[in-house]
């Protein structure tokens, strides 16, 4: 049937900030949905609090609301925009939960649900209702019981044997779930799960540890046409969250009979749940001992796995699901890649591997064992002709300096057994190492329960290593076999060097391959195993078993101008969706100029790897071997390395030397900006202040240099992103401890030492330069003091406390740096304002993580403007082309946007709830996974919105617990006064309480944990504390501080860990009390105001 005509205006709900369990896969689905609905002529209204998304660009919707995703916001938008229907299935768990909250409020009126109706959502999401539905259609389920309090939960212990699986309902990424083995663990996890479930419901079921896990991506339409888009198999057995498991598509160890049973079961489940206009993900488990198959759960929406399945097959799941939601049937929808009907089930003739990316190194003390609660922050995908090739390419894609199955260290056999038995991010590497140590497939299966087929494949890779020595350089057949098995040039060189004590590089292997014509072949992802011609080139490389003909390896369309954009690889802390946003904008800008675009990336979650973002997509590891192969094939007229973060930037010099034309800022300039010594000399010549700094190549030299500079100092290794291993140290003892624990210092890896400007205000500046003119796009003032990583700091645009004269001075210094450095394109500079003196902290001649925020706040798409400048070289013309809202002031020497009549605030979002044992304290090492944006008429309201959107739900009244480190106690009176003025009662332990009382305010004294009961921990658990202000000395995560912060996370209590944000919070609470922050206004309205 054709599209629905009874609806005109559709509200699309986004997923909010990037968090563990919900990443940028929902920007991919949301962007596809918005584009599809607009093309069909619907009026699209969109809500999402995340500015770093493509879907929140003003052109993708008729009205874009960058607002907290709450029931109140949505009801206000529905009323204001006269919404006819809501599409909640493209924004993950966040969108489903809020949609159900709105539905249950009874205030929706005639507004319809698209994609999945409320009844279907309840059936799919409420574990008890889902269980009843499965029983009705004869599906097998784990033995289980539901509970709504601890007493009810205890009944399960009498009926189901340990170990027990506990799952919280309506949570994200397995939050509140886990396996318990005894009563102590049962009590702790049960109480946590009940607290985390928004409906205080938990499921207690028999453990399925060691069972095989599978997923089916299913689509169903109103006419009951059903297709399986993709089957996915988890290499890790049940017990590891599917988001943290290594997965394979298609499923490889199912028999045909098992597959057909699972396929039919999936269709029956969608029919019973009532999903008839979209896609769903259904998860199964199979007992390897007897073949018993049970249903685990289903998601009645587009999911993380949907994004993977879409990229694995080339089937546009989000677009098809959107079309189904508005009335089309599968046979009426055309597959954009092949032009065939969408009712054809995809067929693939290759193997896809997904490996999750973790960043445990950012969270000392966090539990790194993998379980049923998700912990990964990103993922990579690789495509190969065989499992061996695919898995080795995936390992190379992780950006962990892996060359494949690298050797890993272990203490002894018992340690190796422990590391294999307990799932962790390196488990497959330990499995490979165990084969090298003589373990059998049977022994390893008993330890890890990974299917013997996968273990055998890994063993064959390890066994083949024995054949790789210097003879491979002259043995064409052996070298070809190594390459068809996925061995990288780098790994082959390492193995030869290990055997024969040589010093071969990957280049040496490359030249041998070229001489022997062992060259990468590029194949298409086309959903049909080559049966139909692909209209959209989406490519991966493999080494064929026989020699290639030259025509098979050459790219077509050589006459067209084309530019290759290198993406950022897997999401991780320090390099996230913001960089993919810039890459996508680069592609759009090149298309605007008629340039053919080539996107190169390995992240399946992103918009950049969507089939219609660029003209050609290469899904390959971002390493030199694979980059070189694509550049040799395509021979692009330019390569952009500046938008994908540090990942592509580190290849600038090698690619330039190889002959690739880097457009924009040159490799020489990039290298100079990274060289601290050269760059310090450059800044000194310009007469710009910078903190005293030095480098050290040994511990003793570091101690000497730090003493000369004067404590406190900021220390870090060179060449880092996201402030990794960066720390403020206050004395020699702390410095020696840091040098011992955090870095490996040497002549090749010096440590950088900078004067730390205590209590300074940090400033972020984004600018664009064409060599003649400079556009200072945004001057952002950080809310938190200097010393907290810029990626973790909230910031305001325009600045709140920096006068116009100082802003002009900052703009001038930015222009001086950009013009003298030779920047062509984007530039980010971090300044610090200390005692009214401006200091330059850092310069990055590339896209920064604030580019999306500044673009949204000002209405100028900075990455698009910069791309145009990099290709055509004229900044003013590029600005005029994209200045839709007429915000640029062209009358000044240094170009700047006009001061807006509103305030924008960016706030960071953190993963502490998912990483038990980690501290909330912020510092120079970045720890946030995502961001939100608040826009309103003033700072107080904007900051209030940013706190609501980042899940720090500030109370309007109640008790504030204040605990300040000694250094901060002088500000006690100021903090106390602000919160007393708002009507809050104060509570504190000894020292801080005394300070508050002496300041003239009432304060309830509460015991420290070591002083008796009731103490502060009891008060937190009992819900007697409604807001916590807790500052502590760096790295003092112990005692009371540790217990306080663990309970803050467990009971979701709002908190501040530094004074400036606590003071900003007081202003926000005033706005919340007055309800002024609840006003909603679209981004388009703000930009036109």
Swiss-Prot record:
Residues that hold Mg(2+) 2 according to the record: 297, 299
* Cross-referenced Pfam families: CPSase_L_D2, CPSase_L_D3, MGS
Record GO terms (molecular function): ATP binding; carbamoyl-phosphate synthase (ammonia) activity; carbamoyl-phosphate synthase (glutamine-hydrolyzing) activity; metal ion binding
Region forming the signal peptide: none
In which residues is ATP 2 bound? 716, 755, 757, 762, 787-790, 830, 842
State the InterPro entries in the record: ATP-grasp, CarbamoylP_synth_lsu, CarbamoylP_synth_lsu_oligo, CarbamoylP_synth_lsu_oligo_sf, CbamoylP_synth_lsu-like_ATP-bd, CbamoylP_synth_lsu_CPSase_dom, MGS-like_dom, MGS-like_dom_sf
Q: Where does Mn(2+) 1 bind?
A: 283, 297
Instruction: Summarize where Mg(2+) 1 binds, as residue positions.
Output: 283, 297
Of the GO CC terms on this record, one is: cytoplasm
Residues bound to Mg(2+) 4 are 842, 844
Q: Using the UniProt record, name the top-level EC class of this enzyme in a single word.
A: ligase
Q: Which cofactor does it need?
A: Mg(2+); Mn(2+)
What is this enzyme's catalytic activity, as reactions?
hydrogencarbonate + L-glutamine + 2 ATP + H2O = carbamoyl phosphate + L-glutamate + 2 ADP + phosphate + 2 H(+)
Region of interest: Carbamoyl phosphate synthetic domain: 554-951
Question: Which Enzyme Commission numbers does its entry carry?
Answer: 6.3.4.16, 6.3.5.5
- List each copy of the ATP-grasp domain by range: 131-326, 680-871
Task: List ligand-binding residues for Mn(2+) 2.
Answer: 297, 299
Example GO biological process: 'de novo' UMP biosynthetic process
Pathway annotation from the record: Amino-acid biosynthesis; L-arginine biosynthesis; carbamoyl phosphate from bicarbonate: step 1/1; Pyrimidine metabolism; UMP biosynthesis via de novo pathway; (S)-dihydroorotate from bicarbonate: step 1/3
What is the recorded name of this protein? Carbamoyl phosphate synthase large chain
Question: Mind giving the lineage of the organism this protein is from?
Answer: Bacteria, Pseudomonadati, Campylobacterota, Epsilonproteobacteria, Campylobacterales
């Amino acid at each position: 049937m054709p599209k629905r005509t009874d609806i005109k205006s559709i509200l699309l709900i986004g997923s909010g900030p990037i968090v563990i369990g919900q990443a940028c896969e929902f920007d991919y689905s949301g962007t596809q949905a918005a584009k599809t609905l607009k093309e069909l002529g619907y009026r699209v209204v969109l809500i999402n609090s995340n500015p770093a998304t493509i879907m929140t660009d003003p052109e993708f919707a008729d009205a874009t609301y960058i607002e907290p995703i709450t029931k109140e916001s949505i009801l206000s938008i529905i009323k204001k925009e006269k919404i006819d229907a809501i599409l909640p299935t493209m924004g993950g768990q966040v969108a489903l939960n809020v949609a159900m909250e709105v539905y249950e409020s009874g205030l929706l009126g005639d507004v319809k649900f698209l994609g999945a109706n409320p009844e279907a959502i309840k059936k799919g999401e409420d574990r008890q209702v889902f269980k009843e539905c499965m029983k009705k259609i004869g599906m097998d389920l784990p033995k289980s019981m539901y509970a709504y309090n601890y007493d009810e939960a205890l009944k399960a212990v009498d009926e189901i044997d340990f170990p027990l699986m506990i799952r919280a309902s309506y949570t994200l990424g397995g939050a509140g779930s886990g396996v318990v083995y005894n009563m102590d663990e049962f009590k702790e996890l049960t109480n946590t799960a009940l607290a985390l479930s928004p409906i205080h419901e938990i499921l207690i079921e028999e453990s399925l540890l060691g069972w095989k896990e599978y997923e089916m991506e299913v689509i169903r339409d109103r006419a009951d046409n059903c297709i399986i888009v993709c089957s996915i198999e988890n290499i890790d057995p049940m017990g590891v969250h599917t988001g943290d498991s290594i997965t394979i598509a298609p499923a490889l160890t199912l028999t045909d009979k098992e597959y057909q049973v699972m396929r039919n079961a999936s269709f029956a489940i969608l029919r019973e749940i009532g999903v008839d206009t979209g896609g769903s993900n259904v998860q199964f488990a199979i007992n390897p001992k007897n073949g018993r198959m049970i249903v685990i759960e289903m998601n009645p929406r587009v999911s993380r796995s949907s994004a993977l399945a879409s990229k694995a097959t080339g089937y546009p799941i989000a677009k098809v699901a959107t079309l189904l939601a508005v009335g089309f049937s599968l046979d009426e929808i055309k597959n954009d890649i092949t032009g065939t009907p969408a009712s054809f089930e995809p067929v693939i003739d290759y193997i896809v591997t997904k490996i999750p990316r973790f960043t445990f190194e950012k969270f000392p003390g966090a539990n790194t064992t993998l379980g049923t609660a998700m912990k990964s922050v990103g993922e990579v995908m690789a495509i190969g002709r065989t499992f061996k090739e695919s898995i080795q390419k995936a390992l190379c894609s992780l950006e962990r300096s892996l060359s494949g199955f690298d050797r890993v260290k272990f203490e002894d056999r018992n340690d190796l057994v422990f590391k294999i038995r307990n799932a962790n991010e390196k488990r497959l590497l330990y499995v490979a190492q165990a084969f090298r140590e003589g373990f059998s497939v049977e022994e390893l299966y008993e330890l890890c329960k990974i299917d013997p087929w996968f273990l055998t494949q890994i063993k064959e890779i390890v066994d083949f290593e024995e054949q790789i020595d210097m003879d491979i350089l002259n043995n064409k057949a052996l070298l070809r076999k190594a390459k068809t098995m996925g061995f990288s040039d780098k790994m082959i060189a390492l193995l030869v060097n290990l055997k024969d004590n040589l010093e071969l590089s990957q280049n040496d292997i490359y030249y041998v391959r070229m001489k022997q014509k062992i060259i990468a072949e590029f194949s298409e992802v086309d959903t049909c195993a080559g049966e139909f011609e692909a209209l959209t080139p989406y490519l991966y490389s493999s080494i064929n078993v026989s020699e290639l003909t030259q025509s098979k390896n050459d790219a077509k369309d050589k006459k067209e101008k084309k530019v290759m954009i290198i993406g950022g690889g897997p999401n991780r802390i320090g390099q996230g969706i913001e960089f993919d946003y810039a890459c996508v904008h680069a592609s759009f800008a090149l298309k605007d100029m008629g340039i053919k675009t080539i996107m190169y990336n390995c992240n399946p979650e992103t918009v950049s790897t969507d089939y219609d973002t660029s003209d050609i997509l290469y899904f390959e590891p971002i390493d030199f071997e694979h980059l070189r192969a694509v550049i040799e094939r395509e021979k692009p007229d330019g390569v952009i390395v500046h938008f994908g973060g540090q990942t592509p930037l580190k290849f600038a010099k090698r690619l330039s030397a190889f002959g690739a034309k880097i457009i924009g800022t040159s490799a020489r300039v990039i290298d100079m900006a990274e060289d601290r010594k050269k760059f310090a000399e450059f800044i000194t010549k310009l007469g710009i202040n910078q903190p005293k700094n030095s480098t050290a190549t040994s511990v003793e030299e570091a101690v000497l240099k730090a003493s000369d500079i004067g404590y406190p100092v900021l220390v870090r290794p060179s060449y880092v992103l996201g402030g990794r291993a960066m720390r403020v140290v206050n004395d020699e003892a702390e410095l020696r401890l840091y040098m011992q624990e955090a870095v490996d210092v040497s002549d090749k890896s010096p440590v950088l030492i900078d004067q730390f400007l205590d209590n300074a205000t940090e400033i972020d500046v984004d600018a664009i330069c064409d060599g003649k003119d400079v556009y200072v796009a945004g001057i952002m003032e950080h809310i938190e003091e200097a010393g907290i990583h810029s990626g973790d700091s909230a910031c305001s645009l325009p600045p709140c406390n920096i006068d116009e004269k100082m802003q002009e001075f900052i703009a001038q210094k930015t222009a001086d740096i950009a013009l003298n450095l030779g920047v062509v394109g984007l530039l980010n500079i971090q300044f610090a304002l200390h005692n009214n003196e401006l200091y330059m902290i850092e310069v990055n001649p590339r896209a920064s993580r604030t580019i999306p925020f500044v673009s949204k706040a000002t209405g100028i798409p900075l990455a698009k403007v910069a791309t145009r400048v990099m290709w055509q070289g004229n900044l003013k013309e590029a600005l005029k082309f994209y200045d839709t809202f007429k915000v640029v002031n062209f009358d000044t020497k240094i170009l700047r946007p006009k001061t807006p009549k509103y305030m924008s605030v960016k706030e960071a979002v953190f993963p502490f709830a998912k990483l038990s044992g980690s501290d909330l304290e912020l510092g120079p090492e970045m720890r946030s996974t995502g961001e939100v944006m608040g826009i309103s008429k003033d700072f107080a309201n904007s900051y209030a919105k940013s706190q609501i959107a980042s899940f720090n739900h500030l109370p309007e009244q109640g008790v504030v617990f204040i605990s300040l480190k000694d250094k901060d106690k002088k500000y006690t009176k100021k903090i106390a006064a602000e919160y007393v003025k708002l009507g809050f009662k104060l509570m504190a332990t000894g020292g801080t309480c005394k300070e508050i009382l002496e300041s003239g305010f009432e304060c309830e004294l509460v015991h420290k944990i070591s002083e008796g009961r009731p103490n502060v921990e009891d008060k937190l658990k009992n819900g007697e504390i409604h807001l916590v202000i807790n500052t502590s000395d760096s790295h003092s995560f112990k005692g009371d501080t540790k217990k306080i912060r663990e309970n803050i996370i467990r009971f979701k209590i709002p908190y501040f860990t530094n004074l400036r944000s606590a003071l900003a919070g007081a202003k926000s609470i005033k706005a919340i009390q007055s309800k002024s922050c609840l006003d909603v206004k679209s981004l388009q309205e703000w930009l036109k105001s």
